[in-house]
Swiss-Prot record:
Its EC number is 3.5.3.6. It holds the Pfam family ADI. One of its GO terms (cellular component) is cytoplasm. Keywords: Arginine metabolism, Cytoplasm, Hydrolase. Belongs to the arginine deiminase family. SUPFAM superfamilies: Pentein. This is Arginine deiminase. It is an enzyme of class 3 (hydrolase). One of its GO terms (biological process) is arginine deiminase pathway. It is found in: Cytoplasm. The lineage of its organism: Bacteria, Pseudomonadati, Pseudomonadota, Alphaproteobacteria, Hyphomicrobiales. The keyword Cytoplasm applies. It comes from Chelativorans sp. (strain BNC1). NCBIfam families: arcA, PRK01388.1.
Length: 408
């Protein structure tokens, strides 16, 4: 029997979630390539794996079913149709070059599924090529250059796709370093036995198409309940994508209101969830310096089919969100400490917590001031180590792709 997928709130009971263990892709990071791969620093992978397993154990202890991206990709690659579909899109003349594509594709069609999934996530350097070639592309590369790039940002499973109520988006991502992640996940959703017969709609996105300026990432998207969706517009998610997502949700009757939040285009606030996350039905934690400066816009179905009505909001974001949820106001816990500590704890994902159920969140132990304020507000904060994981600029919210979450 197929599972019924859907994420119907930000804090309802979390039932099933997808994560990705730190592995080969993160071990490919170097001081010379980490910025190109969207990391600020290299990571001690062994320690990051320990921290990540502690994070997974914390969720499992509270009854969450945790599935792993790499394992699901391996299981998907055991299906020949799925393997061919994905390799046709990952290994071709445009991606690896004339003279290499056919031979490499043929080789990868035959290898063990686990080895293949390792390559699809961890990359393949010229030195690791399993076939001989005199192709133009391979000829000009050094042994350390990548034929297939590593995808270290797969650890942030939140971004690649996002479940909005009973459907999902397959996100066209902002930077080249992340765009292939969506192709991998699309293969899982299309062919894996857990998903292929589940019958869920795709609201937006298609790895077969270019979406131009319409880019989106899941860290900006929050189905908050009451048929409302919160979407950040900043460094990664554009107004072009927000309009298309809203139009699709309205056309299907899934949402009645999308609140678009204009963010500064800065690294520290690359996604909405780096400065704003829910901890309880009526409680959010925010980095006030950014959130109080957000311009909010309410999108609703237009008078004519297929149109969207857009209106600027004059109230602060927290009041707009409270109104959308039918609440008199939200309780707000700001990043803790003085100005120096607040900036540090926001940078270290103090406001990027993931709720396991109403009033219970997981966050990094290093954010002592913010965690203390949350506890004083009645939130149970389960802390996990993040000395290495935090170097990637993502906390519990970023590292989880909720697949099944209850409504409130």
């Amino acid at each position: 029997m197929s599972l019924v997928y859907g994420v119907h709130s930000e804090v309802g009971k979390l039932r099933r979630v997808m994560v990705h263990r730190p592995g080969t892709a993160l071990a490919r990071l170097t001081p010379s390539n980490c910025h190109e791969l969207l990391f600020d620093d290299v990571i001690w992978v062994k320690q990051a794996r320990v921290e990540h397993m502690t994070f997974v154990d914390a969720m499992r202890y509270r009854g969450v079913e945790v599935v792993f991206l790499r394992e699901m990709l391996t299981e998907t690659m055991r299906i020949q149709e799925a393997r061919r579909w994905l390799l046709d899109r990952r290994v071709n003349d445009n991606t690896v070059g004339v003279g290499l594509a056919d031979d490499l594709h043929a080789h990868l069609m035959e290898i063990d599924a686990d080895a293949l999934s390792s390559i699809l996530v961890g990359g393949l350097s010229k030195a690791e090529l399993p076939v001989k070639t005199n192709s133009v592309v391979a000829s000009v590369l050094t042994p350390e250059d990548f034929i297939l790039p590593p995808l270290p940002n797969h650890i942030f499973t939140r971004d690649t796709t996002c479940w909005i109520y009973e459907g999902v988006t397959l996100n066209p991502m902002r930077w080249n370093a992340r765009q292939l992640e969506t192709v991998n996940i699309a293969a899982i959703y299309r062919f894996h036995p857990d998903f292929r017969d589940a019958g869920f709609p795709v609201w937006f996105g298609d790895p077969e198409r270019s979406f131009g300026a319409a880019t989106a990432e899941g860290g900006d998207v929050m189905p908050i309940g009451n048929r409302a969706v919160l979407i950040g517009m900043g460094e990664r998610t554009t107004a072009h994508a927000v309009g298309q997502i809203a139009r699709s949700l309205f056309a299907h009757g899934t949402a009645e209101r999308v609140i678009a939040c204009k963010l500064p285009k800065e690294r520290a606030s690359m996604h909405l969830d780096t400065v704003f996350t829910f901890c309880d039905r009526d409680l959010v934690t925010i980095f006030a310096d950014v959130v109080n400066a957000i311009d909010a816009y309410s999108l609703r179905p237009g008078e004519k089919p297929g149109t969207v009505d857009v209106r600027a909001e004059e109230q602060p974001l927290t009041e707009v969100v409270a109104g959308a949820l039918g609440l008199p106001k939200l309780r707000v816990v700001e990043t803790g400490g003085d100005a120096y500590v607040q900036e540090r704890e926001q940078w270290d994902d103090g406001n990027n917590v993931v709720a396991l159920e109403p009033g219970v969140v997981v966050g990094y132990d290093r954010n002592v001031y913010t965690n203390t304020l949350l506890r004083k507000a009645g939130v149970e904060v389960i802390t996990v180590p993040g000395a290495e994981l935090g170097r990637g600029r993502g906390g519990g919210h970023c590292m989880t792709c909720p697949l099944i979450r209850d409504a409130l």
